[in-house]
């Protein structure tokens, strides 16, 4: 079986489809499909990751997780939700969590001077906007 999730990352305008397939009792394969080159650059790193057992690579401290290490190498936007989405999909595919949507909702408008949907096209980094 394969667990598939869809992620709409936000203002960058990129979405991703993440497929996680259990390869055996301790390993999964992650395949990310997206127009974002930074996200898809993670595919080789996550082609086979050990999620369970001695020496597992996934459910560790953030700085030690294979998912977050790959993200640190390839994704320039620290707040990108894709790494978290990958981990959630691995949990479901491994049978250690139920498939439940995760939501981030802003309950107040952007402060004056902040980028808005009208002024930010997602093509620049935050540093380039300042």
Predicted regions and their residues:
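A broad, structure-centric signal for solvent-exposed, well-ordered loop/edge residues
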Residues: 14, 39, 111-113
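Phosphate-binding glycine-rich loops and adjacent basic patches that engage nucleotide phosphates
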Residues: 1-10, 46-56, 93
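Short, charged/polar N-terminal "headpieces" of proteins
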Residues: 1-28
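Active-site- and interface-proximal helix/loop "cap" or "latch" segments in soluble metabolic
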Residues: 23-87, 97-98
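C-terminal binding/interaction regions
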Residues: 65, 69, 73-75, 92, ...
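Ser/Thr- (and often Asn-) enriched beta-sheet segments in non-cytosolic proteins
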Residues: 4, 31, 103-105
